[in-house]
């Protein structure tokens, strides 16, 4: 992360998580109802690390431990236009949710819990408000974990289960955004 953007650096936490899925027993009732992924290329430059790979190698071709003198220092660090990304999320979010699960663009309806990626507290509140979802039905971890990028969704799911909020039989929507600008979401019964 580029230090001139220290205000953004304070949003990021650190974590790793995974979910292990198995076939539910016939009496359990757990189920994956819907899944969807979409990418909007106009947001490609909003969250990126331009360096690395073969285009802008970070390390010297002769010595992989030495910095490449031809490399652009700034290109090797994460860059984010948070306000621009949030604008694009709000522009496309309702349509994405409607395509994921009809009715989600207006309310949670039969969904018990929202388990969102949490880029920031402000972004989380703006998204919930735009979708008409009550904040008390969203599992919130941004205040304790920070933005753990892709790990934030399974970490937040775990927190919801461990705290006793999410129980067997609850229908949940898990969703997030990422570089690209990409959206991903699933609706499941836990």
Task: Map each language-model feature to its residues.
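Short Pro/Gly-enriched beta-strand edge/turn motifs at strand-loop
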Residues: 1-3
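Claisen-condensing/thiolase-fold acyl-transfer catalytic domains that form or cleave C-C bonds
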Residues: 90, 94, 101, 109-190
């Amino acid at each position: 992360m580029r230090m001139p953007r220290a205000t953004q650096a304070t949003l990021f936490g650190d974590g790793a998580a995974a979910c292990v899925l198995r076939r539910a027993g016939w009496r359990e009732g757990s189920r994956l109802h819907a899944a969807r992924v979409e990418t909007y290329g106009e947001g490609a430059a909003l969250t990126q690390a331009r360096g690395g790979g073969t285009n802008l190698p970070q390390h010297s071709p002769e010595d992989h431990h030495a910095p490449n003198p031809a490399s652009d220092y700034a290109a090797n660090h994460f860059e984010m236009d948070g306000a621009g990304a949030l604008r694009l999320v709000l522009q496309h979010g309702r349509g994405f949710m409607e395509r994921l699960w009809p009715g989600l663009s207006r309310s949670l309806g039969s969904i018990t819990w929202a388990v969102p990626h949490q880029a920031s507290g402000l972004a989380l509140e703006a998204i919930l408000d735009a979708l008409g979802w009550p904040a008390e039905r969203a599992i919130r971890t941004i205040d304790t974990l920070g933005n753990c990028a892709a790990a934030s969704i399974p970490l937040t799911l775990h927190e919801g289960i461990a705290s006793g909020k999410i129980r067997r039989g609850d229908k949940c929507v898990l969703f997030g955004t990422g570089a690209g600008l990409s959206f991903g979401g699933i609706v499941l019964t836990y």
